[in-house]
Amino acid sequence: ETEELLKFVSLCLGVSPIYRWADPLACHAYNVMKPNGILPWHFDSCEFTLSLMIKKPEKGGIFEYCPFIREPGNENFEEVKKVLDGDRTKVRQLNLEVGDLQIFKGRFTLHRVTKVEGKTPRYLCIPAYVLDPWRVNTPEHSKAIYGKVLPIHIERNEIRSDGLTD
């Protein structure tokens, strides 16, 4: 939450200004994946995500991604469908170790986490950053991920300036 971290992420990306994600349910996200858990293919609602591996599972839990498969104004459904249908041509893997830090553009990068295997859960700290300080998750996204919708999700539910679907 520090200004130093915000500046660090901004400098690494070469993008300024950026803002902390305003969504009260998603702004301080921690991801815990229990054994047999998976995170399916998806795009983030925010432009930038920082991922810090806290605890690694014994096996699995690999971050897979297709960088920049879509861009503002272009969902690129054809290429996304290929990946969802099993085409791994554009898929890359990143096997994060404890302490590894990655910054990625999850709004434009299709990504997932493979099945966590063994008895050890996967713990990740994932603060998020946006170009628009007003944006929050859509009500549908919030309900699907966090199990609830807050008034702010309804108040700020609008078409995204980049024309992409959350």
Each model region followed by its residue ranges:
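Catalytic core of Fe(II)/2-oxoglutarate
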Residues: 67, 73-166
